[in-house]
Amino acid sequence: MNILMLTFIICGLLTRVTKGSFEPQKCWKNNVGHCRRRCLDTERYILLCRNKLSCCISIISHEYTRRPAFPVIHLEDITLDYSDVDSFTGSPVSMLNDLITFDTTKFGETMTPETNTPETTMPPSEATTPETTMPPSETATSETMPPPSQTALTHN
């Protein structure tokens, strides 16, 4: 526990030391100037700082540079649009209603809105017989092969 407290104290002191040594030193009125070895082209020398550094003040600025004021944000000016919040469910599915489907001429399942029960649409009936629709090879194999329910019983 003592080692942990000592570590926290050392870390706190290190942050204070690094802030003081790595920040550029300020000088002149209201800390406008910077202490440098040599002034930049847009600065002029005013006086001598510590450790043989020159206090340099910008020529372009006025008597001293002011910090810009923070922009004022009025909460009354901010308007949020909550119209989409109620309709968003969080799912990636589209907002189409699944209970109502479009009437199609293809085969498939449609829902009737009145009963909410699935209805299977069948193709229009044609006057065909099984002999005309099935190839001769399939009719021969279907006569010789027993139905699938009987084959399952015979293999057990």
Swiss-Prot record:
This protein's UniProt keywords: Antibiotic, Antimicrobial, Cleavage on pair of basic residues, Defensin, Disulfide bond, Secreted, Signal
Region (Disordered): 108-156
Domain of life: Eukaryota
Signal peptide: 1-20
Propeptide: 68-156
Function, as annotated: Has antibacterial activity.
Protein family (similarity comment): Belongs to the beta-defensin family.
Protein name per UniProt: Beta-defensin 125
Organism: Homo sapiens (Human)
